[in-house]
């Protein structure tokens, strides 16, 4: 398979296994959910009745007409413990390497089919210039939420895009399924395409 490089007559030859794969919604959904869950802190915590600070002395006599109560740390009292207290836990889900790579290939293939994958020769930014980056993206017609993927991390490119809330910049090593799925258009350099292919093929 050959993909056209935007702004030139050149083409880049790519593997059908990476950029021509069938889309599996179930697989992509599973990998995206697992990726997002791995980013959850899972640090919420509440105290049970045994962990709440307070006296455990019986609050009132057993007899006398009122309801029977023991410690004031019981869940029915204000300031008491929580009945089924939340505890810190990990939301991490296991995803096999083969599964993850297959999902990434499926996403890239679907982006290509939908015309949302724009390949450029390079995306060099010599100096930090947000206005210049906006003009460059406008010329490519990439929509509101573009994802720029380069072979190596570029500090000038990152700093130029930092103040643009809907523009994301990734190098190949930092590419993830959530960023790909959420982008209107993925702008990727020809060198990055080759590196992605080496990683996923």
UniProtKB/Swiss-Prot annotation:
Record has RNA-binding as a keyword: yes
Xref: Pfam families: Ribosomal_L4 (PF00573)
Name of the protein in question: Large ribosomal subunit protein uL4
PANTHER family: 50S RIBOSOMAL PROTEIN L4 (PTHR10746), LARGE RIBOSOMAL SUBUNIT PROTEIN UL4M (PTHR10746:SF6)
Organism: Stenotrophomonas maltophilia (strain K279a)
Superkingdom field: Bacteria
Disulphide bond pairs: none
Record bears the keyword Membrane: no
Keyword entries, A-Z: Ribonucleoprotein, Ribosomal protein, RNA-binding, rRNA-binding
GO cellular component terms listed in the entry, alphabetical order: ribonucleoprotein complex; ribosome
Family named by the database record: Belongs to the universal ribosomal protein uL4 family.
Function field: One of the primary rRNA binding proteins, this protein initially binds near the 5'-end of the 23S rRNA. It is important during the early stages of 50S assembly. It makes multiple contacts with different domains of the 23S rRNA in the assembled 50S subunit and ribosome.
GO terms, biological process: translation
GO molecular function, one term: structural constituent of ribosome
Family annotation (InterPro entries): Ribosomal_uL4, Ribosomal_uL4-like, Ribosomal_uL4_dom_sf
Region Disordered: start-end pairs: 43-69
SUPFAM superfamilies: Ribosomal protein L4 (SSF52166)
Quaternary structure and interacting proteins, as annotated: Part of the 50S ribosomal subunit.
């Amino acid at each position: 398979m050959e993909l056209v490089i935007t702004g030139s007559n050149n083409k880049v030859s790519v593997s059908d296994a990476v950029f021509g794969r069938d889309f599996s919604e179930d697989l992509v959904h599973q990998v995206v959910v697992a990726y997002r869950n791995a980013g959850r802190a899972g640090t919420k915590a509440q105290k049970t009745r045994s962990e709440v600070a307070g006296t455990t002395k019986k609050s009132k006599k057993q007899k006398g007409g009122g309801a029977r109560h023991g410690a004031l740390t019981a869940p029915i009292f204000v300031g008491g413990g929580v009945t089924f207290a939340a505890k810190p836990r990990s939301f991490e889900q296991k995803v096999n390497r083969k599964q993850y790579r297959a999902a990434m290939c499926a996403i890239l293939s679907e982006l290509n089919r939908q015309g949302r994958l724009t390949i450029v020769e390079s995306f060099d930014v010599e100096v930090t210039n947000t206005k210049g980056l906006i003009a460059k993206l406008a010329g490519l017609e990439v929509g509101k939420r573009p994802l720029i993927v380069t072979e190596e991390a570029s500090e000038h490119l990152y700093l130029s895009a930092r103040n643009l809330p809907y523009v994301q910049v990734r190098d190949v090593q930092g590419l993830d399924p959530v960023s790909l799925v959420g982008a209107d258009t993925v702008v990727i350099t020809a060198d990055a395409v080759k590196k992605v292919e080496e990683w996923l093929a």
